[in-house]
Amino acid sequence: MVLNTKIVLACVVFTLCMACQNTTKLPDPLQAGWQNQAVCEVVENNPKIRVLKCTFPPGVGHDKHYHASHFGYTIQGSTFKITDTTGTRVVEVPTGTEFYNDGIDWHQVQNVGDSTAIFLIVEPK
């Protein structure tokens, strides 16, 4: 009886642990796209870095995705609606803006401006 109780308890703990895990794997920025259309392309991929060029015409965005650690540079800016763990906000992203991030759990963006935005994203490996 003690053995059966231990097995049942172990099964319950295992089930609870599995239920607490995030079962939804989000795409990275290259995989994400917008409404099943690619918005990023690989411009360099080597053993040390991956560089993406992401282009967002007005009205186009980036479906919910995550980012690993990365550096970004804004080749051409615009205005974006950004939704993430802190809520939704509208942000002006000027041309020439650079940024670094240790990683983003998830976000979704949409170009709500009137000009096409272009970013370079550099991801160390």
Model-derived regions, located:
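Bacterial signal peptide processing site
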Residues: 21-23
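Glycine- and acidic-residue-biased ligand/ion/polar-headgroup-sensing regions
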Residues: 67-86
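Short acidic-glycine-tyrosine-enriched beta hairpin
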Residues: 86-104
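A short glycine-rich, His/Asp/Glu-containing loop-to-beta-strand
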Residues: 33-61, 68, 72, 122
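Bacterial N-terminal signal peptides that target proteins for export
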Residues: 1-9
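Ligand-binding loop in jelly-roll beta-barrel domains
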Residues: 77, 104-125
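Histidine-centered metal-chelating micro-motifs
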Residues: 59-62, 98-110
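C-terminal motif of bacterial Sec signal peptides marking the signal peptidase cleavage site
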Residues: 16-19
